A protein has these predicted regions:
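Adenosine-phosphate binding glycine-rich loop
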Residues: 169-273
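N-terminal ligand-binding/catalytic initiation module
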Residues: 1-46, 56, 66, 212, ...
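Well-ordered mid-protein domain cores that form the structural environment of catalytic cofactors
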Residues: 52-58
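Short alpha-helix adjacent to the SAM-binding motif of class I
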Residues: 107-111
Length: 275
């Protein structure tokens, strides 16, 4: 992705698919004018913070201003990133977390309860997290919906960020049908947003159900939440723009704080000619 306004370009480069071996994410950042390399970042470590920040923007523009209770499904690094970022845009009073493994959800509750100025409790079912929550966050690798959309109270905001595969989904058709649907990218909603694609295939909604991209709402080109009773969904699959913007910010902070190691790359004309 290229950000002409900031002068940066870059994106994720990663290796994966080597059997059961791990994956590695690297984020190179370049000068968009000269093409010169500026920084090389650990993309995997950056990702939960970047993705959490995108989720927080969605909450800031789509959740009720007085939203204070959060139900979160998932207890991994992405769930932690989402909750930390959410805490920066809303005054949270209570968080309820569910994930299938009791030890994981209890560890999440203990850790995040120590970090946030609110109560964080582990619950025994996804329904217990969702019912009466002002904000619901899903950060899972589930293949099928993780809660019943009929449980959502009017006025709830949902951030779904764990699944961007056309055959998998975190949200059921009821949730999509009831909501004002805002993806990060309109074209992605029809390509790999499994929750939305399933609802289309079931004949419940069509492409016109996409209210706007989040960027359009932020830019004032489309409305966000219009009523307190409205159910809103931000379907976050991640974008190259988010990655480059986050990398650019970290690069600038590193320069200001004098952190990081400097390495030199020879331009191709020099390396290949020896001049």
């Amino acid at each position: 992705a290229i950000l002409p306004e900031s002068g940066y370009m870059g994106g994720y480069t990663y290796s994966a698919g080597f059997g059961e071996r791990d994956a590695w994410f690297v984020t190179p950042l370049f000068d968009a004018d000269s093409g010169a390399p500026l920084a090389l970042l650990d993309g995997a470590s950056m990702n939960p913070f970047k993705t959490g920040a995108a989720g927080a923007v969605g909450i800031d523009y789509l959740a009720r201003t007085n939203a204070s209770t959060v139900g979160i499904i998932g207890s991994g690094a992405q769930a932690r990133g989402q909750l930390r970022a959410t805490d920066t845009v809303r005054d949270l009073s209570e968080v309820r977390v569910y994930s299938p493994t009791r030890a994981n959800r209890e560890a999440f509750a203990d850790e995040m309860g120590n970090q946030l100025d609110c109560e964080v409790q582990a619950v025994d079912a996804s329904a217990d997290a969702v019912v009466e929550a002002d904000i619901v966050i899903t950060a899972t690798n589930a293949d099928e919906p993780v809660f019943d959309g009929d449980l959502l109270d009017p006025g709830t905001h949902v951030t779904a960020m764990g699944q961007y595969n056309p055959t998998k989904r975190e949200l059921d058709t009821t949730t999509i049908e009831r909501c004002t649907y805002v993806p990060d990218l309109r074209e992605r909603a029809m390509q790999d947003a499994g929750s939305f694609i399933h609802a289309v295939e079931e004949g419940v909604v069509d492409e016109s159900h996409i209210h706007a991209e989040l960027g359009e709402v932020v830019a004032g080109e489309a409305t966000g939440r219009e009523t307190d009773d409205e159910i809103t969904v931000f379907d976050s699959g991640g974008t190259g723009i988010e990655t480059v913007a986050a990398a650019g910010m970290l690069y600038e902070r590193a320069q200001e704080d004098g952190v990081g190691s400097t390495i030199q790359f020879a331009p191709a004309s020099e390396a290949l000619t020896g001049r």
